[in-house]
UniProtKB/Swiss-Prot annotation:
One MF term in the entry's GO annotations: protein serine/threonine kinase activity
Organism: Caenorhabditis briggsae
Localization of this protein: Cytoplasm, Cytoskeleton, Microtubule organizing center, Centrosome, Centriole
Name by which UniProt lists this protein: Probable serine/threonine-protein kinase zyg-1
Active site annotation, chain numbering: 130 (proton acceptor)
Catalytic activity reported: L-seryl-[protein] + ATP = O-phospho-L-seryl-[protein] + ADP + H(+); L-threonyl-[protein] + ATP = O-phospho-L-threonyl-[protein] + ADP + H(+)
Amino acid sequence: MSGGKSGTKLSSFQNLQQIGQGGFGVVYSAQRENGEKVAIKKIGNAASQTRIKEEIKTMKLLRHRNIVQFYETFFENGETYLVMELCEGGSLMDYVKQKGPLDDSTAVHILRQLIAAVKYIHDENILHRDLSAGNVFIKDATKSTITVKLGDFGLATNLGQHGTACTIVGTPGFIAPQVFGQNYDQAADVYSLGAVLYTMLTKHTPPTKGPPNLESLKKRNPSAADLVERMMHTDARRRIQLKEIVMTDYVKAKMGEATPGSREHSRDSRSQRSREPFRSSRDGISLERRPPARSSSQPVNSRRDPDGYRAAHEMPTTSRTSVEPDRARVRHRLSARGIGSSQEDDLRQQIWPIRMERLVGQRVRTPGGRYIVEMNTRCRFEVVSKGNIVLRILVVEYDPHLLIQTVYVHKMSNRVEHARNETDDLIELTRSPISYTSLSQLPKEVMNDYMRLEKMMVSTIASRVAKITHRRPSQFPDASAQLMENGDLRIRFPNSLIVRRKSNGEVHNYIDGFANNKEEVRGLQLSKVREVYACLTQLEQCLSRMNPTMKILPMVFSAGPDIVATYNNSPSSILPSTSSQASRFPFSEISSSQQLVPHSAPIPNKPLSSRTTSSLNVRNGVSSDENTAPAATRQKYKARLDPVTGRIVSVQAEDNRKLRCSTSKPDQFIFTDPSISSSEQRFMRNGRVPERASEMLHALLVYMKKKQN
């Protein structure tokens, strides 16, 4: 096929080669003038215009990493052309025919991607209706990680809520039996998905009549045969549901494996869950991404570092040597709006969208500008030029409902704004920003700003926020160990700070908390650091497998000798029976006859003793009751009475930290810590509590409770 007459839209594409043909059109690979490779589907004028419009409408609507991305459409000589993402690996059917049956790990890896795509279109009330191995495409068959894309939505149909379809369509062998009865719903796609799994495991297409013969598959892997049988059950009412597939023995047994053909796209499972990429778009539509999940998908919260170790905190945790060259190449390639290499593809997954969960409230001021996390879905970068003038403001927002990240650029061309300090008010935004919805749309200047913002979020801001805090671990009884949001481990002593970098595994002790006064940790101390790190990371993994509706993170807990002994054997067994997050949730005024209700923490496998939970935890140092605190804790703080009302209104620590009740709002508190800043920190009882104010808040409330009684 030629590129068309000069001056036409088709003539702007080069190197057109036919790569596929179906009943509704011919597909070509092509190349844009900027070098980007795309797929072009040519639909003849004999095709139904209604069907063409439906396919275009459906493809424009769908944005998901495992669905072929639609770029644009144009019409020439009575024919319709659809420009889409090119999957150079060909169809899954051709791949299996060439390579033979896939191993179980690879099959499960592909199945999980297809489940995600099918679930997404079902959530949009869309049936694919032609889900077959021939319509599943491999992005790049030369890569060790197989990424598949669901394509060809020419037969897709939109269902109303709880609706059904009534047209016989699909690929023989992959069609559910109820389709022939012309009354079917989303369960039909599950049947087709089972047929795809059967093809991957056997290399054969399912029979057009009757169920497939699974005898040979049962001998090889009974659990795989059982899943295929349940997915291809002739009775739609008894067919396994889409959401249940990932919980079957066959899938669960292979989810943790990382073979060359089945390892996950990201470097660790958390990145895989939380960083689904957007792809390039030619009409402002970007690829879908799953909602962000951090460990156990908990609500956002953040804690600023409670001490003055600012110099050590702000040391980058991402190696510039390994990352910067890649990022430079990405900036160069993406500025030309081209699809990058596999390395750039992987990097694109890491940097779009930006992770903001549980980082809300963080601020950083550098000579280049001010970085602020306004909400768990919104951050900004106020870009500063020479002369301390704000050039523009980059605002990044993530919509958890539409699953889209948008970058807004506010240019300060009509007014002069001077750079502000870290804690100053936000600069007012312009009314007409320029918006971008995919990484490839960003011009070079905006790309540079975006990369700076993303790096600051990962290397500095995430290293300030603690995910899990273990006070007084058995290995270091006079310290507090923290697993940070970026994966670093920080063990805080009265006069030093031990840091284990996740990026390179290096462990250093920062004397007095300064970056220029450090020493490498060795010997027995290094072994203890590794023990603490292993315990906290295992605890994090345990929490990540819990019900995502439970509000767990961030977690702060203390453990006495009895519990620590158990903790060293099994991290999951030491979780407090009531929430250890003293600073995270509200505690009402509870009378002596009422029982304190546990909040959002798991119940231990075995009761620690017959004593009540609160008394046992106080004895062991696990503070779980907001209305009680050990006497030693209360004695550390001096209470002050209001001379008029006689009520306790504040407490003060020996190091001059002060916590007082607000006079303007009944549930608001004001905290000052001179060792960090002279400014006041205001927080609500049921909001984010500064960590160094947590214990003081306990004591203040106990004092107030006793005074009332």
